[in-house]
Structures are given as C-alpha cells and as structure tokens.
Amino acid sequence: MGVLEREKKTGKVYIETYGCQMNEYDSGIVSSLMKDAEYSSSPDPENSDIIFLNTCAIRENAHAKIYNRLQSLGYLKKRNPELVIGVLGCMAQNLGDDLFHQELPLDLVVGPDNYRSLPELIQRIRSGEHSISLTRLSKIETYDEIEPRVVNGIQAFVTIMRGCNNFCTFCVVPYTRGRERSRDPKSIVREIQDLTEKGIRQVTLLGQNVNSYKEQGTDFAGLIQMLLDETTIERIRFTSPHPKDFPVRLLRLMAQNPRFCPNIHLPLQAGNTRVLEEMKRSYSKEEFLDVVREIRNIVPDVGITTDIIVGFPNETEEEFEDTLAVVREVQFDMAFMFKYSEREGTMARKKLPDNVSEETKSARLTKLVDLQTSISHEQNRARIGRVYSILIENTSRKSEKQLCGRTPCGRMTVFPLPEGRSASEMIGSTVSVRIESATSATLKGGILS
C-alpha cells in the first residue's frame, strides 16, 4: 500500500465561484469529482477542510478581487494549518506558479483542464508537498461523463463545448481554456433529459464560442434540433456566440420553436471596422449590421444583447463615435460595457500600446452607458401592454412577495405573488404576465387570471 493510500483522508469542501456561467458549471464538475472521491460539500469556509476559489481572468479587477479574498482567508490558515486552499479556473491557468510568489495562503493552483486530478493533488499536499501547480491544457478534455451536482432550482447551465480558436487580440480565453473541443451530442441530450426529470425547466447551453459547436457531424443547429426532438426541456437558451456563426438554419429553428428562446447575445466589442480588425474579430461593422438585420428579419421578436469594449489601443474619438452610432442603429436590449484592460499573454498586450488614458476610457464608458440605459428604457417601455409567457424562476431580490422570471426574449420581469399562493408552489410554473410599467433593467406586470 502506497504512502498516499495509507494517509488518505477526505473532508469538507467549500467552493467559491467568480466570473462567467461556465465557471458556475465547472464548480459543479469539481463538486461532483470531489463527491466521487468521498468528500462532502460545505456551505461555509469557516468549517471546511478544503477551500477552492474558481476564478476569472477576463479583467484586471477580477485578479485583484482574488488576491484580496486569499488574503482575507489567511486567518483560517493560521487557525488550521492543515486547511488546503486552492485557486482554480482561468486566473490559475493564466498566472500559474506566479501566484505562489505573492505571499498568499495558497497550496494549489489548478487550471480548468485538470480538475480530475484534484483529489490526488490534495492528498499530495496533505503528505507534505507544497505549492503544487497543474495547468496543462488539454486537446480532448470535456468532462463529458461527469454529471455536475445540481443546485436546487428550476434552471441549469450545461457546457456543450470548451475553448476557443478565434484568438481575438484582447482576449485571454484561448490561453486559459485552450482550443475548441465539443462534447458528444448524445451525452448532452442525456444530461439535459436527466435534468428535466429532476425538475429543471430551463437550460442555458454554454461555450466560449458556443455556436461553433461541432462533434460527430452535428453542428450547433443540429444539436438544437436534437434537443427539441429528444428531450422534454421546456426552454433552451445559449451563450456566448460569435457573430460569424449564425446560419439561417439556426435562426429558423428559433423562429419556429417556442422552446428555443428568441434571445441572442451578439458581442459587438467595437463599432469601427479598423478597431475590429485590430481586435481580430473577423467581421466589419457592416457585416455585423448585416447579421443583425438577418436575425431580426427571421426572428422579429428577438431580444439582442451585446458586449462592448471602450478605449481599445489607438481608438480615436471618431472611432468611439462609430461605436455609439452602431448602438443607436441596432437598439440592443442590454449591453455589458467595459473599459479595455490589458491581459497578460494576449496579442494586444504584446503588440499594441495601452495608450488611451484612464480618464478618456472612463468618459467614453459613461457616455456609452448613458446611451444604452436610455435605449434599454425605451425598448422596455415599448413592451408595456404586451402579454408574455414567463417561467417563474424565483422571488424578487427586493421582496419575497414579488416573483420574477424572464420573457422568452430575455427581459427580466417582476410581478406580485398572487394572494393565497406561496412562492414555493409558484416557482417553476409558467404564467401569462401583462406588462404594466418598465425601467431600463426590468419589466413590471401582473399575472393574468
């Protein structure tokens, strides 16, 4: 019997998740792998034997947040020297061994393709090893047969592919998540039907470039058709796609099938063709607008959201104004808007000067946010009087007497809990809601009797 086997012990695992929905899904993968290794989950870092921080690397403030969190966990390590603390996810992959040079209470650094090794790595730490880093990228790992532990609720994320081949100059994802590889479509069908039988009503399909999915001759549109034909899931959503991968067949499926929600996240990033070329986005401003027109022509009641970066290297005021012009023309329902932030290892960091001042970036972001907030408000006001089929997802964050859910096109909607009904019996049901008022972020209405 080997040393590791003799000394093996388990314990309680606490996982704290930062960043995107795929990290949420990956935390479920980690939880499942640890459960298979006879560890139990813990809701509280104070009473845990192992703490994992599943991290993001998209922006600089994501790194700062993790450094601060690790420092704040130092007192637990002092109180219990046998506590194992690990950093997982994209920050782990991006920085690797460098994290051990920061004088942080840290034992493990493990990238997204290496989670199967976590139980073994923990035993190595407990056997006396220090500062273990494992950040190999895999060309094949999809965790296909690992069933993530389901969080209580009526909706779930399902990763269908991992990695990205686009290498946009500002983006760290190809370096932290590796090249594209897709899951077996039959495995995805099985997972989603299993979730449905456990009470899940809505799934969101995930991938760094989700609509480039292709496996065993099945493309993304083919996978959607399989899910519509072979599962009974009530609603299907997806994120994040690339504008270059929107075949007409996919849009027609959306137009013809109410279960495939008319809700598309279409990252613009910038509205000027020269800037888009510097970003290596593989489309021009005009081509992006053509995609939007085709989407709206085939799926008239679609909700379109986006991502936009301001202050990219060498972006002039006139080029920024081009972005504002595209935002006015497209009339996005909502946008995630950010100041450009250099990321270690990206081509933009290596080859382009970060030469737009912080003051200018902030001013541009404020201008963009103000414009989009106004557009979002008008878009929502235009929905007043309409009736939507809403899957009740939860109670409102502001009141237990308010329910909330999203329209098929993705707009968050809140409405009163009917008298004599409990929230627990209503969550998971689908109701017709008439919209009565709107803010820039939320529709408000009432359930039709």
Curated annotation (Swiss-Prot):
Belongs to the methylthiotransferase family. MiaB subfamily. Residues 11-127 form the MTTase N-terminal domain. HAMAP family: tRNA_metthiotr_MiaB (MF_01864). The keyword Glycoprotein does not apply. It catalyses: N(6)-dimethylallyladenosine(37) in tRNA + (sulfur carrier)-SH + AH2 + 2 S-adenosyl-L-methionine = 2-methylsulfanyl-N(6)-dimethylallyladenosine(37) in tRNA + (sulfur carrier)-H + 5'-deoxyadenosine + L-methionine + A + S-adenosyl-L-homocysteine + 2 H(+). Its main location: cytoplasm. PROSITE patterns: MTTASE_N, MTTASE_RADICAL, RADICAL_SAM, TRAM. [4Fe-4S] cluster 1 binds at C20, C56, C90. [4Fe-4S] cluster 2 binds at C164, C168, C171. Its cofactor is [4Fe-4S] cluster. This is tRNA-2-methylthio-N(6)-dimethylallyladenosine synthase. The keyword Cytoplasm applies.
